Amino acid sequence: MNTDTEEGIFSEQWRSTTIAVMAAIGIVAYNNLAVSAALPEVGNDLGDVALLPWTISVELLTSGVAMLAVGPLIDSVGARRIFRVGVIGFILTSVLCAFAPSMLALVGARALQGVFAGLVMTVVMAAVGILYPPQTRAKVFAANATVWGVTSVAGPTIAAGLVSTVGWQGIFLMNVPVAVIAAVLAWNKMPDSDEHAERSSLDGRGIALVTAITAAALATAQGSLTLIAVGVVVTLIAAGLYIPHERRSAHPVVRITHIMSPKFRNVHLTSALVVGAGIGVHAFLPIYLRGARGLSIAAAAFSIVWMSTAWSMSAFTASRLQRRYPPEPIIFGASINAFCGTIAITLSVSAEVPIWMLFVSLFWAGSGIGAISTTGVVMLQSRVNLNEMGRINAAHQFLRTVGITYGVGLAGVIIFTTVDRRTGNVETVRELLGGEDSAVNQPVIDALAAGYSYTTFAAVLAMALAIRSARALVRDRVEPVPSAG
């Protein structure tokens, strides 16, 4: 669908399409950043603090499954119709989230929201591969990184203002005008179906099995021996059923080769480890700063700006480096950078250094994560034909999302299990989030700080594993597919 051209992405040929893609990215960017900023106030208002991690994890879980499910449909029915369904659903579920009367209701609304967020994100990533020639894609991802960069500053600023004035509900309601603007700009700009494309049916059985595998695997990270045992058994059974199903199905929800093939698996693994570890630390930063370090609601909400800004800046820088260097060494260098930055975060939290030093460490780690995130997608798109673009993007986004889900889930378990075991009641965190910092709460403060410290150490281990898989990319370099453009 694309043609080779050296024109810029904001030339007359590409301008409207590029703006549409950037607008669609803006939906997901604002939502992801703002929700993390609101966690302390959500926990204080709704209670059931132990469920807080699920307000993020369940959205990631359902968005990941939606990404997989929609990949083959993009290749057959086109991205335009799927984008329209996704953006309308996202608007409606944002309203549901805003008016959730309890933590459990919010978790349910977030599960629905994740489905539609997954549709939008997969469409955007696939559209870049379909619409733009290979030499232009890095520029588009750089433009997308700019959106993330603007949102990384504007999002926390808006979130901090909303949380401290109208409450956490305002964050979800703010999704509505953002999504409406994106819908207007991108409504007719996403690629339509190719009349020669092979038609795919929805793989209902495959979706059910993948959902079971993902949910059961996530259950093993929840700390309970019963859940671990059940999760392992269900994961093995569902995986055993999916393998023969994939071989028999003409249009499986995900092809195993798109995950396990040597030319794909280390890209998936590196990205999932780095992004999952980084967001696991990032998601609970406002809770740590509000509860353990005593920052105000607004200041804690704004704290997420540092890692997300560095993430966006490094994604832009990496896209420029790709014009001169192969992607493999860029990812390897970025993985080392992310590892060193995460060590700095761990030391900053453990030693309780001044807050500004922690922010510098977060910025450092984010600079490595962002480079890997963007470069990995460009690398994958160069390794497949156009008729596989939707599937490979869906598989990658799904695995990244699984990594993030595990990162957030494990971080939540580590933090709140530490608090529960040291104080006997995890709900005591709610008092800290409400601003009660009396001497009676000192054991809770210490437990929350310790739990977050353990979380950062787990992130260091994940970053170390990512260096190994990134090194394998350099060692086993794969040449781009000529027909990828």
Q: Residue spans of the language-model regions?
A:
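Helix-loop-helix hairpins in multi-pass membrane proteins, especially solute transporters
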Residues: 37, 67-204
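Intrinsic disorder in cytosolic terminal tails and internal cytosolic loops
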Residues: 1-13, 434-442, 470-485
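Structural signature of transmembrane alpha-helices in multi-pass secondary transporters
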Residues: 28, 56-59, 63, 90, ...
